[in-house]
């Protein structure tokens, strides 16, 4: 694991732990039980719950992202939609911010966190997870040093 990826994961784990302690979030042990049970509750799970339950993700990524806000509380990343399309059932809710993405090829999951909490999850094949990871790796080649530095925003 490269230094940037390790530092980025560490920052998000810290954010997750702090947000868990300072909010109405379930305690980490309860979050881990939810992850083990496959109960991925939106706005109630943090990156540490997944890392401590499943181990390090196959891929991680961080970028400013636009989201479609859904009535059920999910935030669907604009990148998961075809260009110019919106998700079925979407009305007017929008959100944006620095998102943290985790993808587990062995588990077949793509997870998105905003402000340290799970806002979107999608089951996908290992092949598709690897394709997403390769895309993130390709995109990271074009980031400036300022964008790549954890803590520099």
Locate the predicted segments by residue.
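Residues within mature, well-folded domains
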Residues: 23-153
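C-terminal motif of bacterial Sec signal peptides marking the signal peptidase cleavage site
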Residues: 18-21
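Bacterial N-terminal signal peptides that target proteins for export
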Residues: 1-11
